Amino acid sequence: MYKSINQWSFAGGMDAKACLLAAKAAGFAGFEPAFDAEGPLSPKAGDSGARELRALADSEGVRLPSLASGLYWQHPLTAESPAARKIAEDIVRAQLDCAAALGVGAILVVPGTVGRGFWGGSECTAYADA
C-alpha cells in the first residue's frame, strides 16, 4: 500500500505536471491526474499530453494508479436525453484512451447524481431510474 493524492487536492490552475511534482515533494508515492474538458489530458488532446505525464512520472518515480474526471457532473451517463448520454459515452471512450496512454489501470466515472445535484446545474436522476 502507498499514499496517493488526486490533482483536485492542489490549487486551481496548477497543471498535472506541476501537481505531480508537488505530490512527490510532499511525500506521496502516487498521483491521480484529472481528465478535463480542455488541456493536455482532455478529449481533444490526443495521446501526447498523457505520454508526457507518464514519462515525467517514470522519471520522478511517482506511480499513476488511476485517472479521475469531473466531466460527468455536466454530462451524466444517466441523462434523460439520448443525445446527452451520447456525449457522456464519448467522454468515457476518450478517458479510456487517455488512461491507456498513461498506463493506468483504472478510471473514475461518476455515472450521474440521484436526489440533489453535487455540481450546480447538473442533471439529477431518480434513484429508481439510475
Give the positions of each predicted feature:
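Hydrophobic faces of well-ordered beta-strands that scaffold small-molecule active sites
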Residues: 2-7, 31-33, 64-69, 107-109
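A short, structure-level motif marking secondary-structure boundaries and short turns
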Residues: 3-6, 37-40, 79-82, 120
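Short polar catalytic/cofactor-binding loops
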Residues: 7-14
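Short, solvent-exposed polar/charged micro-motifs at secondary-structure junctions
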Residues: 13, 43, 76-77
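Active-site acidic/histidine proton-transfer and metal-coordination neighborhood
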Residues: 17, 58-60, 76-130
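Acidic (Asp/Glu)-rich catalytic clusters
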Residues: 19-27, 44-67, 93-103
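Glycine-rich, proline-tolerant flexible connector loops at the mouths of alpha/beta enzymes
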Residues: 32-58, 111-119
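Aromatic-lined carbohydrate-binding surfaces of glycoside hydrolases
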Residues: 71-74
